[in-house]
Each structure stands twice: as C-alpha cells, then as structure tokens.
C-alpha cells in the first residue's frame, strides 16, 4: 500500500490546498495531510483547530487521514512508513524553494521521493496568508476557502460582514 504525505501549515486550509489534497488522494492508496506544529510561529488557528477543519472538509474521502507533526518531516515519514512527499506548486518561486527542500529531504533519506503537483490555475494566486489578509480587511473569502470553514474564520477575526 502506497502512503503519501502532504505537509503544510494550512493556516487556514484554502481551496488550493483542497484541490491538491483531492487530486493527490487519487494517486495513492492513503494520503496523510500532515499539519506542521511550529512553536516559533503564532498562527491564526491552533494546530488542533487546523486538523479539525481539514478533517471536516475531507470527511467524504476514506483514504485521507489528517495528523499533526513537529520536527523533521523525514522522521514523520519514517514513523508513517511513507516514501512519498506531495508538494503543491503555484509559481516558479514555489518551485525554487520546494526543489531545495526536496534535495535536503533526499539527502537525509535517499529513499524519499517528492512529487510536485501543479496547482489548478484558478488557485495559483492563493495562499493562506492572502486569505487572512483579505478576511481581516473585510473582503469576501467565499471563493478562497471551503465553505465549511468560513464560520471558523469569521469567528476568529470577529467579522460581521455577510460575504466574508
């Protein structure tokens, strides 16, 4: 059984992330969405909240698991007996960064492969940071994040606008 891992902070999960998750789940037997615990970074949502939101939006996909991890991704991969990392790419700058990370991961464990998936063009501009910015300034995020998590974002940002 081939298990792949799609790591990220997902703060919050976007429609771009969800697009990669759904597509990646079709090319492996099991996909683990691995939510990074970064104690040096204060996110909008806690790790537990992010895990719960991703579970909510992927609940109809039986081969998707959502877990958190801290430390080296390679250690998490070994623990989960996975040899495949899934990474989504939006732009050339994403590729440059992710290529370096893939080389480092391969240096740490030559058995690990990184598979790059191109983001759907309609999400190529989208990032969790831009979602937070748009929401904080009262913009509409309906086309940016899954509908199921809009109430979570509204509550965190304490926003009253209807089309957030």
Swiss-Prot record:
Q: Enumerate the subcellular locations listed in this protein's record, separating them with semicolons.
A: Cytoplasm
- Identify the CDD domains for this entry: PPAT (cd02163)
Could you tell me what reaction this enzyme catalyses? Answer: (R)-4'-phosphopantetheine + ATP + H(+) = 3'-dephospho-CoA + diphosphate
Question: Which pathway does this chain act in?
Answer: Cofactor biosynthesis; coenzyme A biosynthesis; CoA from (R)-pantothenate: step 4/5
Q: A Gene Ontology molecular-function term?
A: pantetheine-phosphate adenylyltransferase activity
Q: What's one Pfam family the UniProt record gives for this protein? A: CTP_transf_like
Q: Which PANTHER family match?
A: PHOSPHOPANTETHEINE ADENYLYLTRANSFERASE
Function, as annotated, reads:
Reversibly transfers an adenylyl group from ATP to 4'-phosphopantetheine, yielding dephospho-CoA (dPCoA) and pyrophosphate.
Q: What is this protein called?
A: Phosphopantetheine adenylyltransferase
